[in-house]
């Protein structure tokens, strides 16, 4: 999926999950030496998927909806139920989930081990981070980027500044002949899916 390189922060998160998958597969091979490589791959994939769900449900979602709404609508995890449909609604995937675009910072922060600005590889304007995986390889790796994601808050939305300019006026301009507008793309996607 080419979107892994959409921006270097996203690239660093994907690399983290791939590394964890591979670490788990190696550990599972020691515990289950008769498993095929396909079984090792799939079992590690399931565990990483579960990690991701735990992070989203327990760490991310309470900050998004607030503790009262979280407890009222989700509450304690009742355990796996094979009768629950795991799919998401088209309206959520197409429209509602796009709300996270509003929390994207105009800067991709790279921080040192003390969570301070990285002097050797400074933070990067978002529009210069689109489809530039070489920045990860040649400019300090994923650790400074992951520290930037952890150590700096998401952008706070204000009524007059919802979506940063890099997403409205410079989307992919650094690597493309023309810039795109993410808000316009989101609206068009909704129209394509028949969302009012």
Predicted regions and their residues:
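Long, well-ordered alpha/beta core segments of mature domains
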Residues: 1-196
């Amino acid at each position: 999926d080419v979107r892994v390189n959409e921006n270097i922060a996203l690239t660093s998160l994907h690399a983290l999950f791939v590394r964890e998958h591979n670490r788990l597969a190696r550990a599972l091979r020691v515990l289950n030496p008769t498993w095929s490589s396909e079984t090792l791959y799939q079992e590690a994939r399931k565990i990483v998927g579960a990690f991701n769900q735990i992070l989203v449900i327990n760490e991310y979602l309470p900050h998004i909806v607030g503790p009262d709404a979280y407890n009222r609508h989700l509450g304690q995890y009742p355990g796996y139920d094979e009768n629950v449909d795991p799919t998401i609604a088209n309206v959520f995937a197409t429209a509602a989930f796009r709300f996270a675009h509003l929390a994207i910072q105009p800067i991709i922060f790279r921080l040192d081990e003390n969570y301070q600005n990285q002097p050797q590889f400074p933070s990067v304007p978002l529009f210069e981070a689109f489809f530039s995986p070489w920045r990860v390889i040649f400019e300090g790796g994923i650790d400074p980027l992951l520290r930037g994601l952890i150590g700096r808050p998401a952008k706070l939305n204000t009524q007059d500044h919802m979506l940063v300019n890099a997403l409205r006026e410079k989307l992919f301009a650094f690597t493309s002949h023309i810039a795109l507008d993410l808000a316009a793309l989101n609206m068009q996607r909704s129209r394509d899916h028949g969302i009012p």
